[in-house]
């Protein structure tokens, strides 16, 4: 039988690996007047095509053809449309008839460009942006990602991994410089188990989305308040049929449900609960816990469509997380306790404005609450973020235009005590009160115009933003050009100016800044491509340069905007598809320097003149991902990644005080940790029981060879000896099963 899959909601658990959520692709469909659809996909010569993805249009359900080109989808509503697609071929639609049992014969023709099937004004391919598009299937099929979108993005060229978390450090930029949008609404806290370097899991489950676009530099004037990158998440649309799925594994359990409401509405709901005790019983951790990491999340959405009023979608998400884990920092050893709550709501309305234009309005916000205690640090944090965006896009002939406005309001309240010296959780140098009551708002307007003439596509954009806290207006011009060289080859160039408001963490009322300017950056990107992302072979190489100004920098009064820096590098991405192998190779080189103080490192080091390597400067990284269909039932995937260790500041001595030993630090980030390397493996098996029950079994191994990667150094009490901090993620095994029933 052919290999059949479809999608659903995976458990929200930090140790949940991609094998588990691959199971969630199997969904049950329950709908009146359905058809059991079988068929064969072949090329123009009549030969069967294996590995073709046959998708039920407008849903997350799909099947994959077997060696003989055959596929089957049960419970498909009559009148529905299937879309068959495979790299190197043009996608082909097929409509399901009213017969109780339908068989389709689909022929794919050779081609290189995937046409849009979205029902709205078409947008041209961005001419000079570093854009990568991922689906939930891409995420779960990448070994070692634990079915997490942020971990999948860490495997891309240009993204540096500096610890065991999922923070996105893009092309020499800090994790805070990445803008995350969900249905046009800003997600101000896009990580779970949040840390200063991001977090240990993404807050948005990939199965809440129909896809994600990740732009690593040179992005257009459509996006503001970001210095480095943009992650734009698109939620699932209206369900076309009823779906239900239940999944269980070592890390947790989950259930999801989706159903249409009449012919123009629909609802989705999902709930996940982690079971950490079972996971850690099978995979003991070298780290000590007095409260195992755990939590739950629930999500839901409502969609309504009207030919006259347009479409409206409202999505809500609620999450709870907690952990109590032993922390080693400098000479301190103690437990870190954290409890978090996160709620997100996003609403999006779209309506055609004439035959060539589309109007879009997004509005929503997220609310984040967190309590943290470790050593002398004790903080209670509350932050609410509200954002809105309105756009009008369309055009005619060779012209395309986009105009709009956006804005957001952030209210931050933090109260507690922190070490006087950043990172001194033992309080050797003392502690002090920490209080933030900060409000800021930003409003922007933007316009982008592009024109294609022969092999040349040019784009020019301009945006202006008002930052209230700094009482300034910024103007950012941006431009890009793509030149087609023929033979599926092209050259891309982009240049632009970018601004972003500084983090509220710099505005401590005790020793923080009173006013900081908006940070700024200038991007220059030059790229070469051969092939197309939808083709059998695709390659991209990009070189870039970034200049930073007005970065926060510590001074006697707290912080000023006197910091600056730069980064330069190159990224390479290669993708090749054979009949029995899907191979992706990537690599990056990076040189970055900054004169800048992270908020949590205030008074930690003696700052020299000039610049130094930031914590996230990883000079090189290389990765390879291979996916192999063993048979119609079994699929195997493996990944390998290596990278230079991150820089760190060594302790070169200590001074004994009444409270203990205070470290004497060497030059900032003058040493480097050992090289990082990791191999991950996963396998899955899918079977059907009758026509209405599908089961998938999965297993995986993270860090297959058990390498002890080092992300931090700790010291003895007098700083006379140092040791690598134990990894919280050694070799880990996972098994589970997902069952879906079609009624």
Regions found by a protein language model. Name each.
Residues 29-127, 160:
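Periplasm-facing N-terminal accessory domains of Gram-negative outer-membrane beta-barrel systems
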Residues 88-92, 98-105, 116-220, 230-232, ...:
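Periplasmic N-terminal accessory/gating domains of Gram-negative outer-membrane beta-barrel systems
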Residues 198-202, 210-220, 227-259, 269-273, ...:
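Short strand-turn segments of transmembrane beta-barrel domains in outer membranes
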Residues 250-273, 287-322, 336-359, 396-399, ...:
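Transmembrane beta-barrel wall of Gram-negative outer-membrane proteins
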Residues 309, 317, 393, 398-402, ...:
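Structural signature of Gram-negative outer-membrane beta-barrels, strongest in the C-terminal barrel
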Residues 360-364, 370-371, 484, 491, ...:
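Membrane-embedded beta-barrel scaffold of Gram-negative outer-membrane proteins
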Residues 452-453, 457, 545-547, 562-652:
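Gram-negative outer-membrane beta-barrel transporters
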Residues 633, 642-659, 676-678, 684-743:
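C-terminal beta-signal and adjacent terminal beta-strands/loops
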